[in-house]
Amino acid sequence: MANKNAYAQSGVDVEAGYEVVERIKKHVARTERAGVMGALGGFGGMFDLSKTGVKEPVLISGTDGVGTKLMLAIKYDKHDTIGQDCVAMCVNDIIAAGAEPLYFLDYVATGKNEPAKLEQVVAGVAEGCVQAGAALIGGETAEMPGMYGEDDYDLAGFAVGVAEKSQIIDGSKVVEGDVLLGLASSGIHSNGYSLVRRVFADYTGEEVLPELEGKKLKEVLLEPTRIYVKAVLPLIKEELVNGIAHITGGGFIENVPRMFADDLAAEIDESKVPVLPIFKTLEKYGQIKHEEMFEIFNMGVGLMLAVSPENVERVKELLDEAVYEIGRIVKKENESVIIK
């Protein structure tokens, strides 16, 4: 007679996998939106594009993970916000192209299925989807003993959005004289964490550093990535934005030039950048060169908009938050980003 426990003996707990599915159903239900078809658990997630009302739809997709920020979530045993980070990294990328997020899929790979922990992860994904207006229509949880340690897991996601063909943001509308507006980040977001972990390798995370305004270090390091979708979508609908840059890995230097043509450059006034305390702390404790900080981190600006001068006031009115005029678009001479 075949051994019914053979799979379990190899390290895969099928029953725990079933429990994960049951636990996450209520979180997935929070994300439902018009267009979703079928129930959770099918072989593929379905979405009716006609429900969006877009006349000339162009699908825009993005995929990403959260890098080694996951290692801090595991170290500090805090798993309820890392899913929001994953969603943010994907949807902020596609909103930069003018897309309204429609749906999201996640992938979690782990050494051992721990239903309570994985529920926290997916709850964070669901919260991110709610903030982005995207439905969580599918995903995969893979138990991979031998590939990962029992406490380890990896997380990635995939977002699909839609844009009116006439409202796609591809850099072609950005011109000399456009004003650069910065939207505040919530913190480090989800890049640069290999360096962050090195700087704070000897810290427990419980420390309240004087530079961090009374917060524990671990709270600041795991602050979830801001999702900009609901703030920026109205600007796209009114065609008020010429270019958008999501400031992630590579900081200002790598990401800002992605929103304009090769013959243009961004001239940024550093004094106008709302640098958050964590970045000053990283620079100080890590002895990082000041100019290198702008090559790695968002420095307090998670999303940058290129806007025609005549539209600046309307953009500020719609955003209804602190908006930072940090620079302008100029003709390129040498560098693509000039920080003064």
Curated annotation (Swiss-Prot):
One of its GO terms (biological process) is 'de novo' IMP biosynthetic process. It comes from the Bacteria. InterPro entries: PurM-like_C_dom, PurM-like_C_sf, PurM-like_N, PurM-like_N_sf, PurM_cligase. It is an enzyme of class 6 (ligase). CDD domains: PurM. Keywords: ATP-binding, Cytoplasm, Ligase, Nucleotide-binding, Purine biosynthesis. Pathway: Purine metabolism; IMP biosynthesis via de novo pathway; 5-amino-1-(5-phospho-D-ribosyl)imidazole from N(2)-formyl-N(1)-(5-phospho-D-ribosyl)glycinamide: step 2/2. Its EC number is 6.3.3.1. GO terms for molecular function: ATP binding; phosphoribosylamine-glycine ligase activity; phosphoribosylformylglycinamidine cyclo-ligase activity. It is found in: Cytoplasm. One of its GO terms (cellular component) is cytosol. Belongs to the AIR synthase family. This is Phosphoribosylformylglycinamidine cyclo-ligase. It comes from Streptococcus pneumoniae serotype 4 (strain ATCC BAA-334 / TIGR4).
